[in-house]
Amino acid sequence: MGVDLDLESISEATSGAIGSLLSTTILYPLDTCKSKFQAEIRVRGQQKYRYLSDVFWEAISSGNVLSLYQGLGTKNLQSFISSFIYFYSYSYFKRLHSQRIGSKSIGTKANLLIAAAAGACTSVLTQPLDTASSRMQTSEFGKSKGLWKTLTDGSWGNAFDGLGISLLLTSNPAIQYTVFDQLKQNLLEKGKAKSNKDSSPVVLSAFMAFVLGAVSKSAATVITYPAIRCKVMIQAADDSKENEAKKPRKRIRKTIPGVVYAIWKKEGILGFFKGLQAQILKTVLSSALLLMIKEKITATTWILILAIRTLFVTKARLKSP
């Protein structure tokens, strides 16, 4: 049973990580524009970016279109590792809980706690990569540094900037995946009831996976958005050192109270929701694509893993006397 548990967890983790990698790459230019737009905080009328599209046009007008992909390698690495850890932890904890209660059906509360625990493990282990990718994205176009240089610019403690908010934001994917999983189970149960028991297993269509992913992510994003923006500002690249000679300005304290005070003072209550539309667009598309791709390749991944296990078991039997 233990072997089956590990194999199924690895299958879930692998398919989830591949889905995350592909969705991250497809939507990366939008993510870069969104991050730079969120990171800027200035008094109304003095903003460099009034609209999200201003970031995109700046890249084009300055001849740095490829800079929309600055930090893509680090982001993909962080995305793949974090998704693998998350889906492995989520699947592993979920199956352990099922074994403990003797049922495969898990309630919403238990599912939420399991997802939050998986998210917390992921945040702690991948925070330096998350910080580095945010700094690269929010750097001036054409001036992004490499991964090692970005991480070693400050102390190693700076590599964990925003960890507190990251742990708080575990409620975001926890809500999303819980809602998605519950809706998915309901749809599959209805599909099984309509189909013949001897027929092939019912699977979620790509379109329905996309819709469920979008619905489950929207509510979580709206609720947690103020924390999301604060996190981006804490992790953003500090270009003020290079720009001090041109236009001196007081730096924002890279702490939760510091960024909250800065947003409140310069932008007011609505500042906590600056870039919300872009965040919803990006996160909904990203999550929906991730889950859609994951659902479509999970079966293939599981078959490959079973084939590999069968190969090793067969070799072991041939070697044994």
Swiss-Prot record:
Membrane topology label: Multi-pass membrane protein
Please cite one Gene Ontology biological process associated with this protein.
fatty acid beta-oxidation
**What name goes with this protein?**
Peroxisomal adenine nucleotide carrier 2
Q: What does this protein do?
A: Peroxisomal adenine nucleotide transporter catalyzing the counterexchange of ATP with AMP. ATP is needed by reactions that generate acyl-CoA for peroxisomal fatty acid beta-oxidation during postgerminative growth. Required for the beta-oxidation reactions involved in auxin biosynthesis and for the conversion of seed-reserved triacylglycerols into sucrose that is necessary for growth before the onset of photosynthesis.
Q: Which PROSITE patterns match?
A: SOLCAR
Gene from which this protein is expressed: PNC2
Q: Where in the cell is it found?
A: Peroxisome membrane
Entry's transmembrane regions: 10-30, 106-126, 160-180, 203-223, 256-276, 288-308
Q: What is its main location?
A: membrane
Q: Which organism is it from?
A: Arabidopsis thaliana
Which UniProt keyword terms apply here? Antiport, Membrane, Peroxisome, Repeat, Transmembrane, Transmembrane helix, Transport
What GO molecular functions are on record for this protein? ADP transmembrane transporter activity; antiporter activity; ATP transmembrane transporter activity
Family named by the database record: Belongs to the mitochondrial carrier (TC 2.A.29) family.
A single GO cellular-component term from the record reads:
peroxisomal membrane
Q: Where are the Solcar repeats?
A: 7-96, 106-186, 204-300
**What does the tissue specificity note say?**
Expressed in stamens, pollen grains, seeds, leaves, cotyledons, roots, stems, flowers, hypocotyls and siliques.
